[in-house]
Amino acid sequence: CDFMEGGITPEDAVWAAKRLESAGLDLLDISGGFGGYTNPGHMEPGYFSPLSQAVKQAVNIPVLLTGGVQTGTDAECLLEDGKADLIGVGRALLKNSAWAKEAITAVQTM
C-alpha cells in the first residue's frame, strides 16, 4: 500500500506477493516512505504492520517489516503479534550504534 489516492491497495500487495513467491522470491520486505509517501498520522511501531500481516498470511516465505521500530520491545511485540517473521530497523540504529545490544537487554527483561 503506497498511501497515495488511487494507489496500490493491500489487496494489490497480497496479489503481487503471491506472484513474487511463485516466481521464486525468498523473502518479502514490507517498508515504505522512501518514495516520498508515508502513512499520514500513523507513526506507531511497525506502522506498515497491517500490510505485512496480510501479506504474511497469504504467503509461505518470510516477511520482513520495517518502519517505526524504535526499541527491541517494539520489535518483539510485533513478532509475537504475528505481524512479520523478521523486523528491519533503520533510523533507530543510525541514531544509536548500541541499539542491538540495548534491544537484546530489553527483550531479555520482558
Give the ranges of each region predicted by the language model.
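Flavin-dependent oxidoreductase catalytic cores
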Residues: C1-M110
